[in-house]
Design a protein with these regions (language model features):
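A short acidic, Gly/Pro-enriched loop at the edge of an enzyme's catalytic core
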Residues: 105-119
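Conserved beta-strand signature within the Rossmann-like core of class I S-adenosyl-L-methionine
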Residues: 146-153
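Core SAM-dependent methyltransferase catalytic element
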Residues: 209-212, 218-235
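Conserved class I S-adenosyl-L-methionine
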Residues: 1-45, 61-65, 87, 186, ...
Length: 235
């Protein structure tokens, strides 16, 4: 199976959007781990006066995590899937939160609202055709000194962690996908995790994009070694 990209991937997420929140709520630690990665941005003053970009916001769980970490910030959520964004917009938000329908490869409206004090990207980079180009765009969107937090699977090259991921997929993700008619999307997600960078490779990718003070931080529980937070700054 070829990897889903661009419009095909957005359409697959559109279809999955009706059950996506239910699926993630059944995943142990999903929301808590996003909140941890949002806190790791280390935004001062509860985010007062700051503008934060939630890149690949999906149904808004990552947006909610940002608000928990920085309740006084202005948060702009962006996603390529109209279906996922419709779910996000249907939730209750303060006036400081807004959403933009745009692929990460074409963010003219997002660019016009910048520059940004921080960018949060959860479960995004392994799904884009050119992660280096996206990281360069993020670097450009940030103010000097702006912070990036990437919350992502990164387990390539570690056999034990790959076994954990395969067990999770076979025990929960695949049965769920078959029941809800989203098998193609979740086959893509399974492969995208296995084929994406190791933690060290992704940290190097961030440095090549111009980021400094790059750190890789683990998540707790079953996701230790499977999911990481990568934090970095634009010099």
């Amino acid at each position: 199976m070829a990897m889903l990209r661009d419009g095909r991937l957005a359409a697959a997420f559109d279809h999955a959007s009706t059950s996506y929140d239910l699926m993630t709520s059944a995943s142990p630690g999903y929301a808590a781990h996003l909140r941890r990665s949002a806190r790791r941005l280390g935004l001062p003053g509860r985010g007062a006066g700051l503008t934060v970009l939630d890149l690949g916001c999906g149904t808004g769980t990552s947006t909610r995590a940002l608000l928990r970490a920085a309740p006084l910030a202005t948060v702009i959520g962006v996603d390529a899937s109209a279906g996922m964004l419709a779910r996000a917009r249907a939730k209750t938000w303060p006036e400081s939160v807004s959403f933009v329908h745009a692929p990460v490869e074409d963010m003219a409206e997002v660019d016009a609202r910048g520059p940004y004090d921080a960018v949060f990207a959860a479960y995004l980079l392994r799904n884009v055709a050119d992660p280096d180009a996206v990281l360069r765009a993020v670097h450009r969107l940030l103010r000097p000194g702006g912070r990036l937090s990437v919350h992502e699977y990164s387990l390539r090259g570690r056999p034990s962690d790959r076994l954990v991921w395969k067990a999770v997929v076979n025990g929960f993700v695949r049965p769920w996908a078959r029941f809800h008619g989203d098998a193609e999307l979740y086959r893509h997600l399974y492969r995208s995790v296995l084929e994406f960078d190791s933690a060290g490779d992704f940290a190097d990718r961030l440095r090549r994009a111009g980021f400094a003070r790059v750190r890789c931080l683990p998540q707790p529980g079953w996701q230790t070694g499977v999911t990481h937070t990568f934090v970095a700054e634009r010099p």
